[in-house]
């Protein structure tokens, strides 16, 4: 009697894992309103980490350094001294 000993081997080798392949979600920082744009009170003007831009007239700063409008008006990005920037909101002339 003929006896066959068949052995089947895997066609793919065991694949190693990788340490790459993931990234954090973007935080969507930056300007949310443009210079000269009309905004309502409470509108977010600029999202940031730290004080890249300082709050000016009628602008508040949140716990995460987000700048927001305190009143309805027009946004104005300005220089504050030589090396600083600020954003202000001025009441729209009626």
From Swiss-Prot:
One of its GO terms (molecular function) is structural constituent of ribosome. Keywords: Ribonucleoprotein, Ribosomal protein. The N-terminus is cleaved by ribosomal processing cysteine protease Prp. GO terms for cellular component: cytosolic large ribosomal subunit. Residues 20-32 have a biased composition (Basic and acidic residues). GO terms for biological process: translation. SUPFAM superfamilies: Ribosomal L27 protein-like. Pfam families: Ribosomal_L27. InterPro entries: Ribosomal_bL27, Ribosomal_bL27_CS. Residues 1-9 form a propeptide. It comes from the Bacteria. Coiled coil: none annotated. Gene3D superfamilies: 2.40.50.100. Belongs to the bacterial ribosomal protein bL27 family. This is Large ribosomal subunit protein bL27. It comes from Staphylococcus saprophyticus subsp. saprophyticus (strain ATCC 15305 / DSM 20229 / NCIMB 8711 / NCTC 7292 / S-41).
């Amino acid at each position: 009697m003929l006896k066959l000993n068949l052995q089947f081997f895997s066609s793919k080798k065991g694949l190693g894992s990788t340490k790459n392949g993931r990234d954090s979600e973007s935080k969507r920082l930056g300007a949310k309103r443009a210079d000269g744009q009309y905004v309502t009170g409470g509108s977010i003007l600029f999202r940031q980490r730290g004080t890249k831009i300082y709050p000016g007239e009628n602008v508040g700063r949140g716990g995460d350094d987000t700048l927001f409008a305190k009143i309805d008006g027009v946004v104005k990005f300005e220089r504050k001294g030589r090396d600083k920037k600020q954003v202000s909101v001025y009441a729209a002339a009626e």
